[in-house]
């Protein structure tokens, strides 16, 4: 038994290497089961899918495999693969990341967060709402990871003021206590950048240890306070995931949808920043509301019986302390600086120009230029370029006439060195890998072959198809990266829509949004992992809370797709640009036609 256990440990330690070597061999039969070109493309896609799900290679390195495998296997020439890594969609996302970097550099996000918390009050239910609203708003523009990493220390400091240091110590695991505590004292720690978080997490996964909470049997008040603490911590990563869906640049799957739409349906121009915001923002608000009600109900944020009535004076003192912590941290930021004002104005300009470029319901400012020349990427890059030369100190005409004034160069709002350090460049490669995969599916005929295999699903009602898609993808993304998940599923959804003869967006949008609805496990998303690493949450806490969150998300998404999304994207019709693609699918190569016809 000892030898067997030792062997198992060695196999586990070498699991990544074994996956790297054995999976390519295990997938070889696919090359002989399908038509040659389609089989080779499916081989590459399944290989990348396994590598992504197991993280045998870093996600961004796996995304580079099409550059190697597509040319070698005769699927696509290198001249067609490499440009997929720098489409205008990638530059739109890059501009959003750079804008987020400037906001973080000037601490504007912390000022916004503390100001909102000062406005909502410090009663538990209202504070949970304030945390969720603030986190979701920040996540619309910053990454989900950065928003969570910033808000958790603020939440912990407020909770320590409400309930005292004694309560938090009991909630921390005995082992590794120093490594899991999120906040020391009542001060707020330095927030790690997303680049630092991704770098630290790529080396391996933290052990998901469930530390038993030492709860006095005779203290219902203690239990209530601990539940409030859990409610605060669990609401932050959930609202970050929800908020990221509201804007096109909020999370990577949204932009992957845009890029793959342009690949599969080149004439499709209905999805842009403005139209997506009009669809997704109301959905985000609805989900936040029901999510807040559920979390507040489950963790006692709306219950005042017991400790509120018996200890009203004590509670008033605790709330005063919490207010003092928020106000002190806000005052520590000092008066608003010129650099903060400049970044805020550029951020507002960034959002307004993206929204108004082509909002669909009225002509946008892009109509002033030649059709098709100005995209969202042009707007984004134009605004963020200003960040690198606009001065961070208020310019003065007196300086030009004061020859004794120092002649040091003015620091810009954002330096390129800082952008290099804080922008997660690996996500750009991950996006490119998804676009290259979509291009390979289209050029090889694999998309058409998949469409032929989906023929039995032609009689599934579209409403049921949407529900099934959201449930399956929401479940799948609990165990795999949301970016990898949507890269794998979108080509299938596009072909399924053609077979069902429904608007492609009717299936592709819910598939994309449901990728962000990963609430049940710590490993589902980086925000979940950050919250779990504080040591205050158990896996069962996330499962019981996240299960209903997933269900509510699926139902609300189905509601949105069958109500206001119908008007925004004209989902009730089968568009001409999809008809063109359907005609291309029908005109299959001879080898592919034989295989497809046999399945019909």
Curated annotation (Swiss-Prot):
GO molecular function: alpha-ketoglutarate transmembrane transporter activity; citrate transmembrane transporter activity; dicarboxylic acid transmembrane transporter activity; glutathione transmembrane transporter activity; high-affinity sodium:dicarboxylate symporter activity; L-aspartate transmembrane transporter activity; organic acid:sodium symporter activity; sodium:dicarboxylate symporter activity
Side Cytoplasmic, residues: 1-16, 77-82, 159-229, 300-336, 394-422, 444-461, 527-546
Notes on activation and inhibition: Li(+) decreases succinate transport in the presence of Na(+).
Biological process (GO), any one: aspartate transmembrane transport
Intramembrane segment spans (from-to): 423-443
Membrane-topology annotation of the record: Multi-pass membrane protein
Subcellular location: Cell membrane
Activity versus pH, per record: Optimum pH is 7.5.
Glycan attachment residues as annotated in the record: 584, 594
Keywords: Cell membrane, Glycoprotein, Ion transport, Membrane, Sodium, Sodium transport, Symport, Transmembrane, Transmembrane helix, Transport
Catalytic activity: succinate(out) + 3 Na(+)(out) = succinate(in) + 3 Na(+)(in); 2-oxoglutarate(out) + 3 Na(+)(out) = 2-oxoglutarate(in) + 3 Na(+)(in); N-acetyl-L-aspartate(out) + 3 Na(+)(out) = N-acetyl-L-aspartate(in) + 3 Na(+)(in); glutarate(out) + 3 Na(+)(out) = glutarate(in) + 3 Na(+)(in)
Tissues and organs where the protein is expressed, per its UniProt entry: Highly expressed in proximal parts of straight tubules in the kidney. Detected in placenta, in brain, and in liver. Strongly expressed within the meningeal layers of supporting tissue that surround the brain and relatively weakly expressed throughout the cerebral cortex, hippocampus, and cerebellum.
Residue stretches spanning the membrane: 17-37, 56-76, 83-103, 138-158, 230-250, 279-299, 337-357, 373-393, 462-482, 506-526, 547-567
Gene Ontology CC terms, in alphabetical order: basolateral plasma membrane; membrane; plasma membrane
Functional description taken from the UniProt entry: High-affinity sodium-dicarboxylate cotransporter that accepts a range of substrates with 4-6 carbon atoms, such as the citric acid cycle intermediates succinate and alpha-ketoglutarate (2-oxoglutarate), as well as other compounds including N-acetyl-L-aspartate. Transports the dicarboxylate into the cell with a probable stoichiometry of 3 Na(+) for 1 divalent dicarboxylate, rendering the process electrogenic. Can transport citrate in a Na(+)-dependent manner, recognizing the divalent form of citrate rather than the trivalent form which is normally found in blood.
Family designation: Belongs to the SLC13A/DASS transporter (TC 2.A.47) family. NADC subfamily.
Stated name of the protein: Na(+)/dicarboxylate cotransporter 3
Gene expressing this chain: Slc13a3
